[in-house]
Amino acid sequence: QVDRKMGDVPEDCFCEPAPNVVVPAIQQLSYSYDSQDLRDLYVNLLASSMDKRVSYLVHPSFVSIIGQLTPDEAKMMSFLSKEPGKDHVPVIDLRVVEDDDMPIKARWRLLCENYTNVFDAIVQCPENVSLYLNNLERLKLLSGETYCYEGEDDYLGIEDSERIRNIKKD
């Protein structure tokens, strides 16, 4: 696969890859036989490490970052990188305000955190997407900004999703 990827690289741009990148990447690649998405990430990293036009951008920590991804998270990152203009993902937290006599409703209970259905069609375990988002944020691959987004249409599909309807019923 690396040979295919390197096919577009001019011969004069080939360089010796850094051993602290290539050795662990090949080791990790051998553990990823069941996930094409993870294999693709390792292959791209290996190919980039052998192309002197971009090899300076390859950091040894990238191997361990890929190693901390699930196949679904790799799919999500691939989806986001290929979607034109996809600089945000609508995410909601569903809370219920506790009923009490206070004039200001200060107590609430979290029913669902970090939920989105944007990735449901591409991941194997849609019920884990909020965990995946937390991990991608922990790895600094995504930034979880908390603010009110004005594009309400982006949220309609989420609010009308089966999971949110079921939570609201309970």
Pin down the residues of each PLM region:
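Charged, alpha-helical interface segments at or near domain boundaries
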Residues: 1-69
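Intrinsically disordered, low-complexity regions
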Residues: 6, 19, 23-26, 89-91, ...
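Amphipathic alpha-helical interaction segments
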Residues: 9, 49, 53, 73, ...
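Short amphipathic alpha-helical interaction segments
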Residues: 17-20, 111-151
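Short, structured coil/loop segments at alpha-helix boundaries
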Residues: 34-39, 70, 101, 122, ...
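Short amphipathic alpha-helical interface segments
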Residues: 57-121
